[in-house]
From Swiss-Prot:
Family: Belongs to the DHHC palmitoyltransferase family. AKR/ZDHHC17 subfamily.
Ranges that cross the membrane: 314-334, 335-355, 375-395, 402-422, 499-519, 549-569
Lumenal side: 396-401, 520-548
InterPro entries reported for this sequence: Ankyrin_rpt (IPR002110), Ankyrin_rpt-contain_sf (IPR036770), Palmitoyltrfase_DHHC (IPR001594)
EC number(s) stated in the UniProt entry for this protein: 2.3.1.225
Occurrences of domain DHHC (ranges): 455-505
Biased composition (Low complexity): 1-15
Function: Palmitoyltransferase specific for casein kinase 1.
Species classification: Eukaryota, Fungi, Dikarya, Ascomycota, Pezizomycotina
UniProt GO molecular function: protein-cysteine S-palmitoyltransferase activity
Topology within the bilayer: Multi-pass membrane protein
Catalyzed chemical reaction(s): L-cysteinyl-[protein] + hexadecanoyl-CoA = S-hexadecanoyl-L-cysteinyl-[protein] + CoA
Chain positions of ANK repeats: 96-125, 130-159, 163-192, 196-225, 228-258
Name by which UniProt lists this protein: Palmitoyltransferase akr1
Record organism: Aspergillus oryzae (strain ATCC 42149 / RIB 40)
Length: 737
């Protein structure tokens, strides 16, 4: 399945004869019409590049008389003059059968293509050594607006070139998900094969395009289709060695024991292609041993560990035990032994959780992707409430009634808003009900020149409202996406942002009240008969030994006050600007870099200073779905580094270091959603949605008017200074969760 076409960047890998499948000839819908070198994405294709001899011959033709050059550069008036003078027709062909429409298509000259079609150009004319159509030429350059125009004008997507490739195969080889979405909605059979029996899914797997593999499988492609050599998509994925592709195929039921005509299983192919590590890792991810058989646990817990619902409850409740064990050890053992014993116990219990994660569902293989962190907070909240009800309240209810009343109120509010933020739909953009609806949306976006990653989500197949973002963790687009918060194991978006802010605000106040109550409680307890301490003085020893468990728990709560205070401050500032965390990251990335602000906001919002870990890439858009990337590189982080990020320790150093490098403060770009501090705050706190109860999905206020973020596709016309978000259409400098 090799390709000699450098312009499509096809990967040549291994001896294909050993796989029982000969590689197809050079992929290219244009034959010699393909430049021998990869041109820049915005570079036009020169005539001399296609055929140097003919290019030299054309050098003597005046530009005004050269129909092919005029088509290439898109000079519609010059083309009109040639037609008016009857020197050429729209269906003029050179000696290889190439038409002006071919040249206009490959150079992305939309106006010229439209003019030629209006002038009667044959949309299905074949030319070049590979006998390809203009649509095929455009597809290999990823000009999907040109492809859409040609399809509208009658281009046949099932036509093939001399090598048997249709436009779907060529688009897959190029690797653009948006072009593939367009073509699949043309009702092209998803499993249409080339001359050697390769389906589009096989090409996507071989090229290492996980986004396209996922798209084909969701569209119904056969995961166990075979080519002439008996190779399945799984075999081809292992030829490339793309772990995401292999994982996705196994997820959709690819046969792990399928044999080629030469009797080679995927395991054998992996060995021949030196991708055995990828194969073994993929098997382990889905609970299979090295032979591809389901793992059998000696303890008989395999079925329990694989149950996502059960494991979700385990990861949420397990930190309850960890918090209790840590506090109990620190409060009941001598300090010299307590600290190391506590560390050993905590790391041991966390190792149990990590071991369960490694054996559990594939999406839980990373502990931070489980409800574990939300369980840490819930466990802390539970033990604070337990200690308060059974120990603090009985002693202080008569001496501090107001303080107890306030704490009870804020503790209840914190619990309510925490649970609501965790279980509430954060603002998932509704999915479309049918492919016909998807096709209608795509057509509308093409008409508006908005069919791109900014306005359409390939994963959800929906039009993206303004301020929305696709969350990889939730696998959905979220309206007015703020961030994905591991402490509530949910996204924060249009529906639960206010509840989330109320949760952290009530938590902030509740912690302060609990600390005061704790000191009142300790002072009310009788002094121990014979206090004995080795480090602290007698007075402090007398105070600590009255109820060490409650004091240690109080210290743990105070630690949480650090990141809670930072988060509340960030959210309040962003509310005053009518700005989300996502927009804050994004606005600062467009030639206006504030490293300290990005590190700070990312850490307090999502538990890490890494924009990638926060789901906020340097442009804020996430991975570019238009570019079907290969396997991502994963950086390994130790336990201490992970926890330092989660507790905000590395944020302090990042803020201090980057703050020294920040240049003079530039003028902040205008925020199209800001209506001034007072109006922004009023819109957020006083919208019609109930504080206690479910709001209408996506409903909010902007400038005093009720809007719905699920259906807001146009930028508000009114512009005010403030905020840090300017453009809703910026290019992602990354590749492209």
């Amino acid at each position: 399945m090799s390709s000699g076409n450098s312009s499509t960047g096809t990967h040549t890998n291994g001896n294909f004869a050993t796989l029982g499948s000969s590689p197809p000839s050079a992929v290219g819908g244009k034959g010699r019409a393909i430049p021998p070198k990869v041109t820049h994405e915005d570079a036009s294709v020169e005539l001399k590049t296609m055929n140097p001899e003919r290019g030299a011959a054309r050098g003597s033709i005046p530009l005004g008389e050269d129909i092919m050059q005029i088509a290439r550069i898109g000079e519609v008036p010059a083309m009109q003059r040639l037609f008016d003078e009857k020197k050429f027709s729209a269906n003029h062909k050179d000696e290889e059968g190439i038409t002006p429409l071919h040249w206009a298509a490959i150079n992305n000259q939309y106006a010229m293509c439209k003019f030629l079609l209006d002038s009667g150009a044959d949309v299905n004319a074949k030319g070049g050594e590979s006998v390809a159509t203009p649509a095929m030429w455009a597809a290999q350059r990823c000009h999907y607006y040109i492809v859409h125009l040609l399809l509208q004008r009658g281009a046949d997507p099932l036509l093939t070139d001399v090598q048997g490739y249709n436009i779907l195969h060529l688009a897959t080889i190029d690797g653009n998900a948006f072009l593939l979405v367009l073509l699949l909605h043309q009702e092209i059979p998803v499993d249409v094969v080339d001359q050697q029996g390769h389906t589009g899914l096989m090409w996507a797997a071989y090229k290492g395009y996980p986004a396209l593999v996922d798209l084909f499988l969701r569209w119904g492609a056969h995961a166990n289709a075979v080519d002439e050599g008996g190779l399945t998509p799984l075999h081809w994925a292992l030829v490339k060695g793309s772990l995401p592709c292999v994982l996705k195929l196994i997820e959709y039921g690819a046969d792990k024991f399928a044999k080629t005509r030469d009797g080679k299983t995927p395991a054998v192919v992996a060995g021949e292609m030196n991708t055995t590590r990828v194969w073994y890792r993929a098997l382990d991810e889905y609970g299979y041993d090295l032979d591809g058989n389901a793992k059998v646990s000696s303890s008989g817990l395999a079925s329990w560990v694989r149950n996502k619902s059960l494991m979700s409850k385990f990861f949420f409740l397990w930190p309850f035990a960890i918090v209790f064990a840590a506090v109990w050890i620190l409060s009941n053992m001598v300090v010299y032994a307590a600290i190391p014993m506590m560390l050993v116990t905590v790391f041991g219990l966390q190792w149990v959780a990590q071991k369960a994660a490694s054996q559990g569902p594939s999406e839980y293989r990373i502990l931070q992707k489980t409800p574990y962190l939300s369980g840490v907070f819930a466990g802390s909240l539970f033990w604070v409430g337990f200690r308060y009800v059974f120990y603090v309240l009985p002693v202080t209810y008569s001496t501090s009634p107001i303080l107890n009343g306030l704490f009870a109120i804020f503790f209840s509010l914190t619990t309510y808003f925490y649970i609501y933020s965790m279980v509430e739909d954060p603002g998932f953009v509704p999915k479309l009900g049918s492919r016909n609806q998807q096709r209608a949306v795509i057509t509308e976006l093409f008409e508006q020149w908005k069919f791109d990653e900014e306005n359409f989500c390939v994963s959800c197949m929906v039009r993206r409202p303004l301020r929305s973002k696709h969350c990889k963790r939730c696998a959905r687009c979220v309206a007015k996406h703020d961030h994905h918060c591991p402490w509530i194991d949910n996204c924060v978006g249009a529906n639960n942002l206010r509840h989330f802010v109320l949760y952290i605000t009530c938590l902030e106040v509740g912690i302060v009240l609990f600390v005061q109550l704790t000191f009142n409680y300790i002072n009310s307890l009788p002094a121990p008969a014979q206090p004995q301490c080795n480090i602290i003085n007698e007075t402090l020893c007398d105070f600590v030994l009255r109820d060490t468990f409650t004091l240690v728990l109080d210290l743990w709560v105070c630690i949480q006050l650090v990141w809670i205070t930072m988060l509340v401050a960030v959210q309040m500032i962003q509310i005053s600007r009518n700005q989300t965390t996502y927009e804050n990251m994004r606005g600062h990335s467009v030639d206006r870099s504030y490293p300290s602000s990005r590190a700070f906001a990312s850490a307090v919002a999502a538990g890490t200073t890494s924009l990638n870990a926060a789901g906020l890439t340097s442009s804020g858009q996430g991975p570019n779905p238009a570019l079907a990337q290969g396997a991502p590189r994963h950086r390994k982080h130790g336990c201490l580094q992970q926890w330092s990020s989660l507790l905000g320790i590395d944020t302090f150093f990042a803020t201090a270091r980057d703050g020294l490098r920040d240049g003079p403060r530039a003028v902040r770009p205008k925020n199209p959603f800001s209506r001034g501090v007072v109006t922004n705050c009023r819109d957020f706190w006083c919208d019609p949605a109930p504080y206690f109860g479910k709001r209408e999905p996506g409903a909010a206020m902007l400038g005093g008017e009720v809007i719905n973020y699920n259906r807001m596709y146009e930028t508000p016309s009114r512009m005010h200074s403030g905020g840090g978000y300017q453009s809703l259409s910026v290019e992602d400098p990354e590749q492209g969760v």
